[in-house]
Amino acid sequence: MGSCVSRDLFTSAHKNCPMPQGADPLNPDLPSGRTPTVAPDCVIGKDKQMDFCWDPWQRCFQTTNGYLSDSRSRPGNYNVAALATSSLVGVVQSIKDHITKPTAMARGRVAHLIEWKGWSAQPAGWELSPAEDEHYCCLPDELREARFAAGVAEQFAITEATLSAWSSLDEEELHPENSPQGIVQLQDLESIYLQDSLPSGPSQDDSLQAFSSPSPSPDSCPSPEEPPSTAGIPQPPSPELQHRRRLPGAQGPEGGTHPPGSLPSMDSGSLWEEDEVFYN
């Protein structure tokens, strides 16, 4: 394929046509009876003048009225500009078929999910009425895109609010001393735990012994003058002894630590330390 040359540069191309071998160049002094020999590839005449399209195979000439094929060219020849135009049209159509249309379809599916599945936060229900569906179908593309963008922005706002709420909850869990509600809840838990830990081992043993002891006979009843013997009846622990047992690390009545069988009671300070270790 050759490249077309501008018409302005070759307006007088017929004056410089190549001459065949053995022919003399044009001379104004030639007699009128002798006709000059002209090359067959050159057209002389102002009315027949045409733009010269240089091609190595001499396949095309471009005139002011259109395209004119050379007499020696075959009928299956084509023009470069027409080929380029058709190729460009084909490329554009391929882009529309394979890129633009699938993208538009995917965007339309997302918009339909937002509008029809109730993602735009309608409190009445998840399904829209048929009238609203028809109204959405009749909307132009600009309004659909606007509603789609509004739905996406709304979803982003909802997600951001949810994440901020989660982050605030995490901060409250990491720093429970800053929240008064957490302190009240911890105090309630401490009181419940202390109430559950009050019935200790000796008191339970006393109740078992009281249920298992036989009923006293009338012969064994003490006389009114004699004081009742308290040798076999265990005495309940005094309040001071109970208070000492509640404190962690407190000594017993003899100054020693708690026996291994007794259940040590927990105070508020130890519970607070356990909560801090758990949260950290």
UniProtKB/Swiss-Prot annotation:
One Pfam family matching this protein: FAM131
Region (Disordered): 195-280
InterPro entries in the cross-refs: FAM131
Skewed-composition ranges (Polar residues): 197-211
Residue ranges with Pro residues bias: 215-227
Transmembrane residue ranges: none
PANTHER family named among the record's database cross-references: PROTEIN FAM131B-RELATED, PROTEIN FAM131C
Family statement: Belongs to the FAM131 family.
Protein name: Protein FAM131C
